Amino acid sequence: MSVLRILALLAATAAALPAQAKPVLHGAATENGIRWQSCLNSGFQRWFDEPPPPGLRCGYLEVPLAYATPPAHAAQAGEQTVRLALTLLPATGPKKGSVVMISGGPGLPGINPYLGNDGHVARLRKSYDIIGYDPRGVGQSTPKISCQVAEGDETPSPDDNDVAGAENQTRTLIAACIKQTGADVLQHIGTDEAVNDLNAIRHALGEPGLTAVAYSYGTKVAALYAERFPKKTRALVLDGVVDLAEDDFTQRLNQERGFQQSFLRFAAYCGKTDSCQLGGGANQALQRYHALLRKLHEQPFVTAAGYEISADDVLTVTRSLLLWPERWHELATVLRQLDAGIAGQQVSDLIDESYSPDADDALNVITCADVANPTADPQLLRRQRQEINIAAMYAHYLPLHEYPLEMCDLWPYRGKDRPHTPVASAALPPLLFVAQRYDPTTPYRNAQVMAAAFKSPLITRERDGHTLVLNGIDSCVDESVVDYLLAPKKPRHDKTCR
């Protein structure tokens, strides 16, 4: 399973918006290029799995496909454009501004951001609209990233250690991306453009300075925005922090080390409960987990409903549920049931929850638009792939002798990322960083070095987990976050929440 797939599990995933927004008229209202309408209108029905709250507004913003230098706020006549999908949850009282929610991934939709239903969120919503948006290429924004391989072009799944077969399958997928999405779009779909999109959204909202909350990969967008537009920044919260100084290899290596640490902490949790068969120490936990994966690799489990569960399915669910300790009991149940051969609907539902072909396509394409280097030494890349895979021993259940090149290794267009230690402009106000001590996928150290670079305070939560701000998980964290968003100029210091 490609490590890129793991990154799709990053960050704040979408859920239903709170329903306590004030009702608004169903007619349209235009705001600097965004034509807001009620999300109950028929044109937006496909945006939501469930009916949206009556007060939620939906709209689009046209931005350039390729930004000029310096970037313009809006598309010019005759040039190719991207249409960003946005939502607005109105403030419950007199409005003072807007808070833009920046989703993770890359490639996760953001029009339906999850907010806790508690006093801290209510205090923020009293005076601030909440803005969600799908990044370019994602969700309801167009053109949409698609890498669907046409019928008849599929290649057979390669056997274990079939490097040539795996790389041929990846080349087929890349060809489908180019055919379905377009070469011109693929070369303007990365984080560099996402930063300019964020500034265009700020301008369209009529905000002199951006106020935003960013999760996981979204913190990369936010940090680069702070560097590029310091005078147009009001307040930025970065939760689950990406280190701008890390190249792709270093980031992925550290992520795998983080997942390995979280697996061992999950195994320790298992040792304290009778409901998990991984108890008994780290080595025993690894042996039992590997034994289960090897069994499923040789013979996938088939539920009574005919649902097939493979070893890769279990790895995907494991990585997903390791992100949030509140769900470790579900992971324990999955592993226990599969080990006993009695897995049912709960297990298949969790697997379905962890898969999203659209998110996978967006993740891969946006990542490659950032990091691909067509002239890199293939042998160096293979050695790096090996080091990345070995770093997470819990997932290393099969002996691999060679490591195929992955999608970004074979991507034909050079990525625009330039890893660097950020330098905070004197014009930039303080940001606010949030991190959890045992975050599996954006290691705690990231937040430390980024907060230092931006000369900004860091809130440390001494727990496991990945992203939590405004989700109703920790009152200590959310109180400080809302205080900052309401009064960002007030002096603040580092804080620890336990």
Predicted regions and their residues:
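Bacterial N-terminal signal peptides
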Residues: 7-15
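Gly/Pro-rich cap/lid or specificity-loop segments adjacent to the active site
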Residues: 22-313, 365, 371-498
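Long, low-complexity segments enriched in small/aliphatic residues
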Residues: 335, 339-340, 344-384
